[in-house]
Amino acid sequence: MTRYFSRVVAVAASAAFALGHAACATGSTPSASKAATDSTTPSASASVDVKQLTVAPGKLTIATGKPAYSPWVEDDKPESGKGFEAAVAYAVAEKLGFTKDEVVWKRTTFDEAVTPGPKAWDFNLQQFSITDERKKAVDFSSPYYTTTQAVLTYKGSKIAAAASLADLKGAKLGATIGTTSLSALNKVIAPTEAAKVFNNNDDAVLALKNKQIEGLVVDLPTALYLSAAIIDNGTIIGQLADNSGGDQFGLVLQKGSKLTAPVTAAVDALKADNTLATLEKTWLSESISVPVLQ
């Protein structure tokens, strides 16, 4: 549900805005592996030669957005391994037994990646939220990241000084259609005025920039990026509690892919050895300083 970014000034890890429908607490929950596709097994069989299961034998073809933005991919160059998702991709590749030189990158739109049918890549990552509806069309690995929702506004707005959910009840708030952000807005904040719903994130951001709405609900990494680089005098009021509808991001694979189990095992191993936590701290560290609204 989100792709739009560029690294910002002294931000140890600014955040991202993914064009299209990306939505979006950091880390994974104890039951995270349940979010993966039902066909996923706990680990890959030791007898499986993963390199013979890929779309191009001996190579691992990984897809991401076009373009891809910070902090997920730095400078739109996933091959650099810089940015949270670029780094995760190479870490997964290594766990699967591929060297960096054996990784091939492709670009796709967000929507085409989660559309049913054959894929020209082995897995795709661009902040895909794991949902039951999407699992009907594609496979997911276990989650590599979980994010909360946040409320973004601009300095001088009626809600700029809001310190609680109650302070937001009467505000003009908006979010993108079909996102966890919109669901959290309606269920957690439950504003007295109907939420403004936008067809895409670009429209939502433009509405906030033009002060047609007073606050925008997006995933926290996106809010951090927008406040620093896109919205003039942008400010984050706070994030919603962990249980308020955080998205779990998973790697997308073709439905029924023989790589789903090995890739999930790789993600689980990266979680177990704290690699994911280390990469999160490196690229998404700003998230921890945003207050939680109660």
Residue ranges and their predicted role:
Residues 51, 180-196, 235-236, 267-294:
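Ligand-binding clefts/hinges and TM-proximal coupling segments of bilobed small-molecule sensing domains
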Residues 35, 44-124:
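Extracytoplasmic small-molecule ligand-binding "clamshell" domains
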Residues 102-165:
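Acidic, polar ligand-binding/catalytic clefts
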Residues 86, 90, 94-95, 179, ...:
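Extended ligand-binding regions for polar small-molecule ligands
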Residues 20-35:
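Bacterial lipoprotein signal-peptidase II cleavage site
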Residues 112, 128-137, 186-187, 214-245:
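A ligand-binding cleft/hinge motif common to bilobed small-molecule-binding domains
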Residues 66, 146-153, 221, 228-268, ...:
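Periplasmic-binding protein-like
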Residues 81-95, 129, 147-203, 215, ...:
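Bilobed "Venus flytrap"/periplasmic-binding protein-like clamshell domains
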